[in-house]
Amino acid sequence: MKLLFPIFASLMLQYQVNTEFIGLRRCLMGLGRCRDHCNVDEKEIQKCKMKKCCVGPKVVKLIKNYLQYGTPNVLNEDVQEMLKPAKNSSAVIQRKHILSVLPQIKSTSFFANTNFVIIPNATPMNSATISTMTPGQITYTATSTKSNTKESRDSATASSPPAPPPPNILPTPSLELEEAEEQ
């Protein structure tokens, strides 16, 4: 979409895009409508032969947002100053709020991944997924359920999970095929 929008915007901002020869009575690549008079909330952008090309407020907002945020490095300083939002704009307030919340999201613990799973025609089970991320190492995921942990606590000789393979050995396709055949 980012790659197509500049082409789309350049076609929209041309002097006149005439689609009336097909009989559609639309302008601006179909976003505007050719009418005798524009409604109160619409703006006249260009002419459609003898009529006006009227564009609704959503299209005007779309164009302004693209010019404001999509092409800041292309426009000169005068145009950028004209398109800057007001200081109390809701978009600026939302952006500041999102940026202030990001550190809190990153600092959440791994217990945030605990889910309650309900399977139809079965008993509900509490499932926790723990992932470890260390640069340069393979990530292993351990999943436990209530029934698994209860059984392992009750048994005196609870076996430990199998040791992960060493990180230096990479599996080859032939080894993967042999393992699949064994299972």
From Swiss-Prot:
Disulphide connectivity of cysteines: C27-C53, C34-C48, C38-C54
GO-annotated biological processes: defense response to bacterium
Record's keyword annotation contains Protein transport: no
Location(s) in or outside the cell: Secreted
Biased composition range(s): Pro residues: 161-170
Keyword Transmembrane helix: no
Record keywords: Antibiotic, Antimicrobial, Defensin, Disulfide bond, Secreted, Signal
Signal sequence segment: 1-19
Cellular component, GO annotation: extracellular region
Disordered, as annotated region: 141-183
Family: Belongs to the beta-defensin family.
Function (record text): Has antibacterial activity.
The protein's name: Beta-defensin 129
Annotated organism of origin: Gorilla gorilla gorilla (Western lowland gorilla)
